[in-house]
Every structure is written in C-alpha cells, then in structure tokens.
Amino acid sequence: MVSVTHCDSLWFGADIITMRGGNYQLIPQGAIAVTGDKIVWIGPHAELPPIHAARQVVYEGGLITPGLIDCHTHLVFGGDRSNEFEQRLNGVSYAEIAANGGGIISTVRATRQASEQQLLEQALFRLKPLLAEGVTTIEIKSGYGLNLESEIKMLRVARRLGELLPIDVKTTCLAAHALPPEFIGQPDDYIDVVCNSIIPQVAVENLADAVDAFCEHLAFSPAQVERVFLAAQKAGLPVKLHAEQLSALRGATLAAKFHAISADHLEYATESDVQAMANAGTVAVLLPGAYYLLRETQCPPIDLFRQYKVPMALASDANPGTSPVLSLRLMLNMACTLFRMTPEEALAGVTCHAAQALGVQQTQGTLETGKLANWVHWPLSHPAELAYWLGGQLPATVVFRGEVRP
C-alpha cells in the first residue's frame, strides 16, 4: 500500500458504512482522506497515519454511506399523465385510455413536440428531489422519442443534466421501448430504423453509455431484441434489458447471452433465467415502484437471486406511466416490505450493486481507497433506518467528488 502523507481534506467523526462486498462493513468512528476527487485513505480514525490535511471536516456523529445510485430512470420526457392516473381510478381501462390517444403514445407525442430547453427544465424539476436524498449517480434512458431526431434530443438533455448539476449521469438509448404510431403493424420495420439509424448515430455522437430494449408481448419479441443487441455490439455499446416484467419470455436469458450488464424488472424470471444471469454476471435491477403502481401480485424471485448469488440492484424507475416516483429512499422501504429484501440488501441495491448495473463498480458504489469521494452523511444511528423511515431524515450533507454539494 502506498503511504499517504498529504491530502486535500480529511473527514472524520462519524461511523462509516463502506458496503464493500455488498455488506455494511461498518467502520466505527472512521476517517476518510481525499485528494482531488478520490479517496486516498479510509479506516478507523484511531488508526489514521500521520497525514497533513489542507482542510479538516469534523462530523458530530451520524452515519456515512456511499453516494446513492439510481440505476434505472426515464426522467426526460414531455407532458404529464396524472389525468390518466385519475381516469384509471375512476374505472377507465388502460386500453380505453390508449384508444383515446393516451398511454405511452401521449408521452411520445408530447416529447416530440417539446424543445430541448423545455425537456431540460422539466427534467431538472424531477431530478432535484433525488439529489436532495443523496443520489450522486443516475441513469437516464431515452425511449419516448422513438425516432432519430427525438431520441437524440432526449439523450442530449440527459447529458446536459450532468453538466448543469453536481451528479454523474449515465445515459441509455432505449429506442426499442415501444412501437411508434407511424409504425403500427410494422414492428420489424421499426427495428430496422433502431438498428440501422438510431443506434449508429447515437454511438457516433457519443450520447449513450448503453443500449436497452423492452422485451414483452406489448413491446418487442426476443428475436427483435436480439437484433437490437447485435446492433449495439457493432456500435461498441453494452446492453441492458427490460425483461420478464409482465410475462415469461426468457428475455433475461437472452440478456445473459449477450452478457448484459443488467436485466430489469424480472417479476416473471424463471430459475433458468436466474442461472443464466449468474453465469453471465448480469445484475438484477428490481423496480418496486412499478410493481406497486401496477398492483402486481408476482414478486421477483428474490430467493433464487440469493441462491445463485445474482447481485440485486434497486432503482426508482421514475417515469410518467408506471412509476411516477422521485424517491430512491422510498424504494428501499418498498423493497423490504414488498419484496422481503433485508435493509442491508436494499442499501447494497442502491450503492455497490447499482454501480455494477451501470458498469461503474471500479470507481463508485463503495467507500474504499481509489474510488470517487462520493458519500452521504446521515443524522442516523443505524443503517437500517434508511429503509425503515418513510419520509423525513434527509442527508445532513452530500459529498460529490470530494466537495460538499450545495
């Protein structure tokens, strides 16, 4: 280990939850030395070697956790669908809403009509509550443009969010999200556009960190998704997949075949799906917000993920249709109460395993030497409180790349 004699800042006075190995890995009364945006030393304050710090920050108790990571969102979109929420509760079916121009197509229409500036302002409004909860990294998907111009517009807005706010933004091209209205009855023709036009151009402009698709009866077949994944491979982009949310199509197995970094939703994943994911190193991203809003009854196979040691990540799935959720903390509680995950598993789901689901585990997700100095200081005494409390208990401070975030 390289000896550290100087650092830019030294932080101590709180217990540190490092989340190394997916466990709390508590350091009582810990200390963190930071140079630039990296952690250069971490451990018990009593074992701190002689280090000259240009600045010292003393916490008065509390807990430090890694910065939270929301690894699956659809934050950039136009319009509002709260009226549909009310309609459904008044007995109008989803099919009736869609037949009258509602549903995802209404979001596509509004997104296409909105300017980049309008989309940016709306997304900023949605992102700020997540920042307030201690989110330091977020993934944002396209998927409401469904043509080259609008998909690129969405991804540009997502990239811009990361430039305007102190947060790391990872972008995902989800052009294969739904069938646009101009291609009704022609899904293979639309997949041609996705593979031959949208993905290559997104790659050329460096607007996406990954490619995603929705494998479901109401979206795209495994064969169509495979074409999307082949196009992503050709463009040099890793893949992810919305899989097994509403039915068992073996999408998770297809994702594993392409060594997807994650397969998401997974309520209907089978044991063979889980085995394939385990062998491929594919992370299971669980989305309790959508499960809750859709009043689903089949939970993801949590025990199988445990048995086969598939990492379980959690995310808000923030979107206008099935998960209008702007709280990652709420997802911790829902994962525990609805999916019977433990508070430790849930916290791993929004830190180390979420980092793995985005392919950034080498730099984020745990607190250890060499990783980014992203953490949250909480006025709490036990990490289980993060999943226990509903509302309140916001962070005392958030540190992003070595600096206190305003």
UniProtKB/Swiss-Prot annotation:
Primary residence: cytoplasm
TM ranges: none
Entry-linked Gene3D superfamilies: Metal-dependent hydrolases, Urease, subunit C, domain 1
Annotated residues for binding of N-formimidoyl-L-glutamate: 144, 319, 321
Pathway assignment: Amino-acid degradation; L-histidine degradation into L-glutamate; N-formimidoyl-L-glutamate from L-histidine: step 3/3
Disulfide bridges in this chain: none
Listed GO CC annotations: cytoplasm
Origin superkingdom: Bacteria
E.C. numbers: 3.5.2.7
Locations listed in the record: Cytoplasm
GO BP of this protein: L-histidine catabolic process to glutamate and formamide; L-histidine catabolic process to glutamate and formate
One Pfam family hit: Amidohydro_1
Binding site for Zn(2+): 72, 74, 242, 317
Family (UniProt): Belongs to the metallo-dependent hydrolases superfamily. HutI family.
Name of the molecule in the record: Imidazolonepropionase
